[in-house]
Amino acid sequence: MNPCRGICSPLPRLSAIRPKTNAVHFLRERRSVLRADDRVRTGDLNLGKVPRYQLRYVREVAKSIVGEAIAPKWECNDYRYLVTSSQNAPIFWMNGRLATGHSQSSNDPACLEDGGFWAVSTTFEGDFRAAKFDHVIEAPFPQTPWEKISGTWSSSFNESQYIAYVNKVKEHVAQGWVYQVNACREISIDVHVENLRGLFSLILEGNPAPWACYFQAPGIDIASASPELFLKREGKRVRTSPIKGTAPAGTVDFGMKDKAENVMIVDLMRNDLGQICKSGSVTVPRLLSTEVHPGLVHLVSDIEGELKDETTWAEIFTRLSPPGSISGAPKSSAISVIKDNEGKRGAYCGALGWVQGDQCELSVAIRIFFKDDKLRFGTGAGITWASVPNDEWEETQLKARRLVSLAGGVL
């Protein structure tokens, strides 16, 4: 496999490279810079005498970054391309931003105030996880192969159990306890892979999404095909774009149930933004717009506002989390129903993306694969009084079907 695929341009002929040594190149030089155990010196790279077994992978980083260790005792002091000894090093990618050089991890959103580039994953339950990366460039995601999974995915609810859950939510609606609940289930399968990079490569090819993201750091491995924006920040301006309403591709118009569901969440998100934005600044510039995505269509709205002075990142996450579209309305009551009926969602239905200074792009962490002891994927549907239980089950299948087909296995 070409270790530079997706980062470097086509490589020249490498007859001088000995067997078992992967080629590492400089685009500017257009020539080999590594030969087995030879001392390596170029204008951009000084690795000293590095054993060849450590020279396996290459990733681009900003020139003049100093001092990232590639293995014990060996350091780059001035480089354009960094040689790494493992393809399992922390990495983050979203919308063309490739971040490497993991230097710090934190569970405190106050860390975001330092102005550095932080990849962020929050859980539905409110846990905050962030990894700081020192090197950020514009680059495509490094392509990695994926061997498709075999076997059958297990679901936290089978069809009859999920339908019973939907009916229970409808009872809560009838009692006036909630107006809407996003009822979810988790599917999982045993898998033995080092990471999900190869799966994310397939996602980018087979299910491109506006907020697709890959985040790998200690304790985190998430491959996302999220279609939904949780929060975009540019200075004082913030925007959220909740999705409520899903239908098969080719659907021309959504019914009243989907439209009512969307408007409920728009109202909820207006209230959430109102807690951190200046009075009178919250607006809805787009309402009930149809967006086309691979295999389905969504109903989307935009809510915008201007942040109050001195608003911190900790306040933003506290006031807005979890996202309204994947909890329900009223949010506190919906969360109570979810906790009573579902297991822990974890990274699914949290927030996922990056923060740097007063800028951010955070997606709603839906359509994500995440890995711990198993490979997991969440899917759900918004339940209102007008919900037809069998239709809601089919919606969860629709959301999972295309992506699971990329990963492999039987849904």
Annotated model-derived regions:
Residues 74-411:
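Extended alpha-helical targeting/anchoring segments
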Residues 26, 53, 57, 79-81:
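Aromatic (phenylalanine/tyrosine) cluster motif
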Residues 1-20, 25, 32, 62-79:
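N-terminal, intrinsically disordered charge-dense segments
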Residues 45-55, 126:
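Extracellular interaction modules
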